[in-house]
Amino acid sequence: MLRAIGRVYFRLKVEGLENIPQKTNFIIVSNHVSFLDPLVVMAAVPKKIYCIALRDLYRIIWMKWFLFLTETLPSGSVSEKAVRLLTRNKNVGLFPEGGVSRDGTLNEFRRGAALLALKTGRPIVPCAILGTFEALPFGARFPTPRRITLKIAKPMYLLKEFDTVIEDTYLQDGIFRVRNKVKEMLYAGK
């Protein structure tokens, strides 16, 4: 149903679908400018994605119901739940800005996605979503039809040098590289 709505109402366009790993599970990481973003990822990627949402959203009754239907997980103990999913060969979707951008710009990324990648050895698939801010900006109540594009980059493996402690420098470097890839896709051609 999500795919049908995405393709008809939003004229969803997907670039780089061939970059989705076929032989391993993965962590999708994307910018976050609208509440539509997780739905776009779930509609566009033909594999099941378990997205992580802010725990506060579960306080809104209709949102809690919707998050339950889409099998979205609350944040908080993200790494524990996400590690469990990844070790069970499930795919995880994260929006590491920590919330929806109120002005549509790309904010700094938190390190959780890099930590997951380093802990599990799974690749991060950077994505850039364009058009959702215009379709449903922060504070809007109902989406308007707009062209939405999901750009998918090649998987990135974040490897640590030693099998001991994951150092802060690995996390910072890893998430910096992922954010730069998302930024590059967002602003390509502008």
Regions found by a protein language model. Give the residues of each.
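Alpha-helical membrane-targeting segments
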Residues: 1-11, 59-70, 139-145
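Short gly/ser/thr-rich secondary-structure transition/capping motifs
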Residues: 7-15, 73-77, 132-134
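A residue-level signal for beta-strand positions that form part of recognition/binding surfaces
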Residues: 11, 25, 48, 147-149
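Catalytic core of membrane glycerolipid acyltransferases/transacylases, capturing the structured
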Residues: 20-81
